[in-house]
Amino acid sequence: NFQGSSGPDIPIFCSGLTDRDPGKDDSDNVIYPEKDTEVESKNPVVSIKDEIDSNTWTRLFVSPLKTFEYDLATYNPKLLATVLKSIWPTPNGTVCTKLDKIIAKENSYSDMSLLAKHAKYIYEHIESDEIGKGVFAYALAEKITDDFIVPNYISNAVLWACGGKTL
């Protein structure tokens, strides 16, 4: 039972996934965190995570960085840039030129701030009017391979829903 509701629990493991949504910094700039960086969440659901997790059957799994799409771009920049380039409406324009530079990095980043900039670029173009999350998701699903890195919070959410265990 959640937030004082009454009645029987449904004995099924249920995972929730939510974005961290770090918001803006003191200069009013949207935050795009670097990999493995702690950031404060502005998502109100995160504040009730402990309450959700206290139920036998429910767990809330929160993005450690920003959003689902941003996190995937942080862990898989080459693949996401490749997919985005394949569906971008102007293949010879500046967007595809920048995506080529990201692809050429071969996921090899010693500078985490550059990785964050590239993930931001990918994220902003996925969210653009030219593409959109839904179209991008379908294109990405066609290209996922065994070496695709699934962030731990997503893996743990799936594992929890399948039997109440995590990594």
Q: Could you say what each language-model-derived stretch is?
A:
Residues 1-167:
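Acidic, divalent-metal-binding catalytic cores of TOPRIM
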